[in-house]
């Protein structure tokens, strides 16, 4: 399935039905009064979060959504039928913004959560409303009102508590595949991961925590280089970041500094949240490197460094314990 995390759509609520002009015509009522009924209300447009959806792909092929109009009134003061609400389903984690005003209308995070985005027009009034002592046979009636129209920007931000970040080939996909049941594509070339991958990591208690593997970032990602700008938004909701540094890289310290620079450039508080610094691929390092690299990284970045290998399992239990501690959950 193609992963689409941004979409623009236009929505239009239904128009209210017109009121009508009508008079009673019963056989034994020779001077029948006005009996024109009111029009029905136009259909509203509502967005609803659906946990079964993972992408905004559907909106790539359909971008105009229009609710039905209300029905016109009838004789004998009968009100026209109101139109049904048009329900548009979106993935949990979808932010909705009005393109005309740039206002954030809502953030649908919980399954079943709804957001009214366009209200249907009111029905017009039939001539029965205009009966008075002065006018016993009014012919006045009103048309239904137009429904609201909006152009919307939909933006999906994944609902993960832990985000894995690092330069291409830092070992993020391998790590998430070992820790969870996720099976991302893994290969030895940059940008193997082209979309974010989610995996649920189970704690001994049986509860699950969602990890997100964010596609590899490169220098300039915050300004749109590589794949990073498209996917940095997906770590905005995370509570903890795992910063993976490839220990087999020619210059792991420079790699770590590049990624920190991108997080800082993107902003939105990414540098302020808890971040675990992890040196990966320890199985590829000799004893001298295993002793020197963690100390150099720690001295340069000013924080502790954990050493892991997703291949041998070294350090994984300790890493998870730190994650649970940062999240404030029991292991």
Curated annotation (Swiss-Prot):
GO cellular component annotations of the record: cytoplasm
Record note on quaternary structure: Monomer.
Domain OBG-type G: 160-328
UniProt-listed InterPro entries: G_OBG (IPR031167), GTP-bd (IPR006073), GTP-bd_Obg/CgtA (IPR014100), GTP1_OBG_dom (IPR006169), GTP1_OBG_dom_sf (IPR036726), OBG_GTPase (IPR045086), P-loop_NTPase (IPR027417)
Enzyme class: hydrolase
UniProt record similarity statement: Belongs to the TRAFAC class OBG-HflX-like GTPase superfamily. OBG GTPase family.
Cofactors required: Mg(2+)
One example GO MF annotation: GTPase activity
Function statement: An essential GTPase which binds GTP, GDP and possibly (p)ppGpp with moderate affinity, with high nucleotide exchange rates and a fairly low GTP hydrolysis rate. Plays a role in control of the cell cycle, stress response, ribosome biogenesis and in those bacteria that undergo differentiation, in morphogenesis control.
Protein name as it appears in the record: GTPase Obg
GO aspect biological process, one term: ribosome biogenesis
Keywords (A to Z) from UniProt: Cytoplasm, GTP-binding, Hydrolase, Magnesium, Metal-binding, Nucleotide-binding
Binding residue positions for Mg(2+): 173, 193
Obg domain residues: 1-159
DNA damage listed as a keyword: no
The protein's Enzyme Commission number: 3.6.5.-
Residues reported to bind GTP: 166-173, 191-195, 213-216, 280-283, 309-311
Subcellular location: Cytoplasm
């Amino acid at each position: 399935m193609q992963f689409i995390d941004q979409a623009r759509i236009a929505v239009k609520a239904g128009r209210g039905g017109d009121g009508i002009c009508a008079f009673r015509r019963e056989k034994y009522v020779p001077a029948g009064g006005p009996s024109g009924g009111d029009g029905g209300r136009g259909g509203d447009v509502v967005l609803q979060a659906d946990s079964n959806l993972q992408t905004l792909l559907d909106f790539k092929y359909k971008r105009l959504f229009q609710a039905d109009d209300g029905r016109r009134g009838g004789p004998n003061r009968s009100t026209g039928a109101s139109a049904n609400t048009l329900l548009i389903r979106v993935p949990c984690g979808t932010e909705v913004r009005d393109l005309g005003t740039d206002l954030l209308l809502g953030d649908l995070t919980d399954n079943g959560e709804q957001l009214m985005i366009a209200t249907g027009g009111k029905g017009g009034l039939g001539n029965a409303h205009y009966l008075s002592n002065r006018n016993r046979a009014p012919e006045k009636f009103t048309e239904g009102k137009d429904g609201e129209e909006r152009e919307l920007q939909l933006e999906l931000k994944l609902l993960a508590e832990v985000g894995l970040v690092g330069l291409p080939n830092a070992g993020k996909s391998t790590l998430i595949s070992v820790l969870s049941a996720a099976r991302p594509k893994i290969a030895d070339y940059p940008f193997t991961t082209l979309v974010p991958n989610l995996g649920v990591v189970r704690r001994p208690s049986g509860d699950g925590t969602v990890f997100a593997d964010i596609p590899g970032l490169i220098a300039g990602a915050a300004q749109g280089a590589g794949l990073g700008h498209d996917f940095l938004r997906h770590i905005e909701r995370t509570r903890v970041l795992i910063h993976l540094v490839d220990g087999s890289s020619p210059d792991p310290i420079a790699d770590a500094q590049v990624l920190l620079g991108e997080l800082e450039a993107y902003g939105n508080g990414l540098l302020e949240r808890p971040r675990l610094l992890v040196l990966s691929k320890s199985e590829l390092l000799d004893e001298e490197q295993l002793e020197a690299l963690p100390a150099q990284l720690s001295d340069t970045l000013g924080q502790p460094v954990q050493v892991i290998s997703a291949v041998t399992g070294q350090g994984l239990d300790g890493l998870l314990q730190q994650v649970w501690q940062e999240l404030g959950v029991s292991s």
